[in-house]
Amino acid sequence: MQREVELFLKAYPSVEMIEALITDCNGVARGKWIPRGKIQSILDDGLKLPKSALGLDIWGRDIPELAHANGDIDGYCMAVEDSLKPVLTPRGTDQGQLIMTMVDETGAPYMGDPRQILAKVLEGFSERNLKPCMAAELEFYLLPDPGRDKPLRESLDSLDTLGGNLYALNELDHHSEMLDLLRETFKTQDLPYEGIIKELSLIHISE
């Protein structure tokens, strides 16, 4: 992976920090910030995180039975191939991202890692000469800023609760600055981008 790092650092000279992240059982990203000079060592040797980091509750708190019963031993987080990507921030592309997956001390997949569980499921399909295909849709709501020290409820009360104007292009144009930034973020990380539509609710958008 040395060539991968060299090409990345050359293409993004402003990157000073990398998010080395792994996804826990709730789909929340956990991990460490890694300085630019440590990227190669992380790709070569991985990094340690407690195995219990993948079993936190949704609030990020330890589950005592997981964290303390075995002394909260470490797992080894190894880089997922081709996952070193730039991250678009308000300052530009001055940050990177590296997706990790956890193995145990023998190098075997740690089955508390959702990514490893999914890999095992895919193995079953492969053994049957099957290839699952899927499409992901990101749905979200855009809410007015209620202002400092004001409850969000005030913004909701001001909205037209009837909604409507389904698939309206002018509604997308109204939020074009934010939606253009979203599109650029997808492009920066080489993520598939098929388009955006306005849903039925006044503030409901789908990508």
Question: Residues of each region from the PLM?
Answer:
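Conserved small/polar residues in nucleotide/adenosyl-binding loops
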Residues: 203-207
